[in-house]
Amino acid sequence: HQIGTFYVKENRSDPKSRVIGIGFARYIARKPKGPPVFFLPGGPGGSYIDSVPPQFKQSGGPLLAEELLGRCDLVFFDLRGYSEHGSFLKDRAFKPKSAPPNATLQYRVREFKRFAQEVVERYRRTVVDLRGYSVLECVEDVNEVRKKFGYQKIVLRGQSFGSQWSFGYLKKYPEAVER
């Protein structure tokens, strides 16, 4: 098996974009009986990279992975910006205020918006280009790896946000999806 990092432009629409790393793991079947399965985690922040064989069940690895091991290639992704095996966005300078126990929904929404605006403003003063952190960029990450490994068609298995990521891929590259 392989565990490593692949490198992509942070923002593919910017020719001067910096390069970021994204972690992956690939398990190659000796005699595959079907197309590879790409496992896309939930998140943001989910990862399957450290829950790889033989500890799938013990570590809370993705459903079906253990059953598929050896039957087809398995490819596990980290989400860009949340990869211990690549680039990791860390913003520990801001700690949101704890909401009072009787806080209204409006208060919580207002506090979340304030939090999000402050974090975005802080990133604007760094080398990070937040325009590169979108579902569309994640879709392109999957497609680059699919092509790099020489897969014509893939099967997508997404959990939580990974399902949205899968739908985005299916919409943009239907010809590359087996199911």
Outline where the language-model segments fall.
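Gly/Pro-rich cap/lid or specificity-loop segments adjacent to the active site
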Residues: 1-21, 25-179
